[in-house]
């Protein structure tokens, strides 16, 4: 059996629409082994929305590897242990795709390079901002081109924390993407280019005082926040409590605030405020560090049947 741990991820990070993302220390575990025949899929918790047949996203990701290398198991047993909440903007689908590809590559003897796995994951996901950090960890700036993902990975220091606000409702990425306009104004494109560049500079140099400006966006958040009750309240609460910036995580509905080494004070201020605020949704709150490793294998036993 092969056991793979794959992190959650947050995409866009404000202005970096479809090209920036960071891996977070919240994990799914994928356990796979070859069996004599058939396909057996189990999950914990046992969520009925998770397909238990060939439509399962982890299986589909694994099959892309088998198709690519021309090797197929006789049968598969897949067990999914999920901590990443579904359809909350924290990269649950990217974790399934990147983790499935990573596990399948191990199962077939490591025939694909890391670059090839990164490309397959981004191609299946449609964009690299979640799938690439899920695969390799860290803060990633990436673009998907023909047959290749061009990217830069930055190791995020432990002093930068990610305060994650997770509501008690789901929001599908497809719906949140369809609400976006087909065309944008030139000035809004210029606005985002400047902020995305500033964000990259602020993070890589440690100049976190630039983050309030660098996390502003005009391409997706003004439209998507209409789908998220309490969005402005949560963002304003975060900034008033000392966050360096706050933004929608991926397509939402989760919201992330960036905090520094004073995160314990921030955490207490937020918890006190949440207890007294009049909010439409119920919001879970946790503080996470970046995961700089990405998908990792932590258990390998005998995985292949005699042929």
Swiss-Prot record:
Sorted UniProt keywords: Amino-acid biosynthesis, ATP-binding, Cytoplasm, Kinase, Nucleotide-binding, Threonine biosynthesis, Transferase
The keyword Transmembrane appears for this protein: no
Residues annotated for ATP binding in this entry: 85-95
Keyword presence, ATP-binding: yes
Primary site of residence: cytoplasm
GO cellular component: cytoplasm
Subcellular location: Cytoplasm
Molecular function terms from GO: ATP binding; homoserine kinase activity
Pathway(s) per entry: Amino-acid biosynthesis; L-threonine biosynthesis; L-threonine from L-aspartate: step 4/5
EC number in record: 2.7.1.39
Domain of life, per lineage: Bacteria
InterPro entries: GHMP_kinase_C_dom, GHMP_kinase_C_sf, GHMP_kinase_N_dom, GHMP_knse_ATP-bd_CS, Homoserine_kinase, Ribosomal_Su5_D2-typ_SF, Ribsml_uS5_D2-typ_fold_subgr
GO terms of biological process kind: threonine biosynthetic process
Catalytic activities: L-homoserine + ATP = O-phospho-L-homoserine + ADP + H(+)
Family according to the record: Belongs to the GHMP kinase family. Homoserine kinase subfamily.
PANTHER family per UniProt: HOMOSERINE KINASE (PTHR20861:SF1), HOMOSERINE/4-DIPHOSPHOCYTIDYL-2-C-METHYL-D-ERYTHRITOL KINASE (PTHR20861)
NCBIfam families: PRK01212.1-4, thrB
Biological role: Catalyzes the ATP-dependent phosphorylation of L-homoserine to L-homoserine phosphate.
Protein name: Homoserine kinase
Organism, scientific name: Caldicellulosiruptor bescii (strain ATCC BAA-1888 / DSM 6725 / KCTC 15123 / Z-1320)
Organism phylogeny: Bacteria, Bacillati, Bacillota, Bacillota incertae sedis, Caldicellulosiruptorales
Gene label: thrB
């Amino acid at each position: 059996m092969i056991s793979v741990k794959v992190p959650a991820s947050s995409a866009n990070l404000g202005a970096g629409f479809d090209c920036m993302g960071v891996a977070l220390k919240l994990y799914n575990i994928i356990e796979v082994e070859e069996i004599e025949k058939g396909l057996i899929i189990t999950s914990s918790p046992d969520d009925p929305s998770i397909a238990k047949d060939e439509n399962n996203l982890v299986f589909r990701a694994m099959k892309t590897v088998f198709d690519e290398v021309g090797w197929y198991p006789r049968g598969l047993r897949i067990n999914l242990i999920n901590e990443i909440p579904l359809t909350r903007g924290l990269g649950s689908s990217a974790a399934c795709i990147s983790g499935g590809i990573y596990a399948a590559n191990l199962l077939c003897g490591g025939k694909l390079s890391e670059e090839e796995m990164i490309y397959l994951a981004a191609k299946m996901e449609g964009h690299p901002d979640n799938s690439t950090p899920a695969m390799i960890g860290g803060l990633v700036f990436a673009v998907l081109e023909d047959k290749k993902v061009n990217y830069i990975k930055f190791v995020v220091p432990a002093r930068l924390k990610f305060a994650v606000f997770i509501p008690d409702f789901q929001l599908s990425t497809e719906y949140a993407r369809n609400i976006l306009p087909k065309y944008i104004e030139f000035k809004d494109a210029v606005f985002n280019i400047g902020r995305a560049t500033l964000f990259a500079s602020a993070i890589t140099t440690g100049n976190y005082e630039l983050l309030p400006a660098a996390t502003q966006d005009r391409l997706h958040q003004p439209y998507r926040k209409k789908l998220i009750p309490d969005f402005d309240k949560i963002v304003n609460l975060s900034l008033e409590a000392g966050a360096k910036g706050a933004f929608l995580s991926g397509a939402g509905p989760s919201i992330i605030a960036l905090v520094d080494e004073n995160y314990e004070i921030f955490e207490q201020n937020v918890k006190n405020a949440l207890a007294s605020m009049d909010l439409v949704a119920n919001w879970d709150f946790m503080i996470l560090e970046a995961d700089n490793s990405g998908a990792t294998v932590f258990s390998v036993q005998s995985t292949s049947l005699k042929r």
